Amino acid sequence: MWDPDVYLAFADHRGRPFYDLVSRIGAKRARRVVDLGCGPGNLTRYLARRWPEAIIEAWDSSPQMVAAARERGIDATTGDLRTWKPKPDTDVVISSAALHWVPEHADLMVQWATELPHGSWIAVQVPGNFETPSHAVVRALARREPYAKLMRDIPFRVGAVVGSPASYAGLLMDAGCKVDAWETTYLHQLTGKNPVLEWITGTALVPVRERLDDVSWEQFRQELIPLLDDAYPPRSDGTTMFPFRRLFIVAEVGGARRSADVS
């Protein structure tokens, strides 16, 4: 179960990639803007300010997140992103930190490029940190008893969870898009007690929490603390450096053909 309050504990840090993504969208005006994986809606509200004339459509698979988004005045829908279909007036599709949960997300992006009108925009951001300690120590601890028997069928994300900027760009260019793709590593300077643990509690640990009772969950968290401290040691000033790699893909549908015509 996703907890909007836990997720929002690092709202400033989590929000920066969203704004970096949206800043590269070239649409001056838009009829309909769609936020796929809207979460609690705190960032979706910015889209209404960026495109004040647009209808804002928001989706998330978590009923808890959708409820939180609706409390913020967002017309959000609970649904599987794999079933979403663009309406004819859709000019901008944004998905920030959501599509990595969908194994076939690259195919979805290409499908959207074939279904959206020419001149529309697709903007996607996904994390690319699945081999870092914040994920690796969780997988390692989950393989130990007494946890292993409870979590052996959790599809922990490992290996090629996401592609490279070049791989996404190539797929969308082949679909006729003009593409801007890049990656960056944010160096988050976290404060507070066990900040990396609290960060992943709102994301990577969600499927773990669903399998454990309250006592086992607290025990699991306590056993994670020294493992995370070894990987992300707190500084003497109280901050903890938390590197976080993210990938960005911004595509203009039909833009490649238009560029060729101009040249």
UniProtKB/Swiss-Prot annotation:
EC category: transferase
Q: Which UniProt keywords apply?
A: Cytoplasm, Methyltransferase, S-adenosyl-L-methionine, Transferase
Q: What is its main location?
A: cytoplasm
Its domain of life? Bacteria
Gene Ontology terms describing biological process = methylation
* UniProt-recorded Gene Ontology molecular function terms: trans-aconitate 2-methyltransferase activity
One GO location term (cellular component):
cytoplasm
Report the EC number(s), separated by commas if there are several: 2.1.1.144
Q: Does the keyword section mention Lyase?
A: no
Q: Name where it's found.
A: Cytoplasm
UniProt xrefs under HAMAP family: Tran_acon_Me_trans (MF_00560)
Family per record? Belongs to the methyltransferase superfamily. Tam family.
Q: What is this protein called?
A: Trans-aconitate 2-methyltransferase
Species source reads Mycobacterium marinum (strain ATCC BAA-535 / M)
**Classification lineage:** Bacteria, Bacillati, Actinomycetota, Actinomycetes, Mycobacteriales
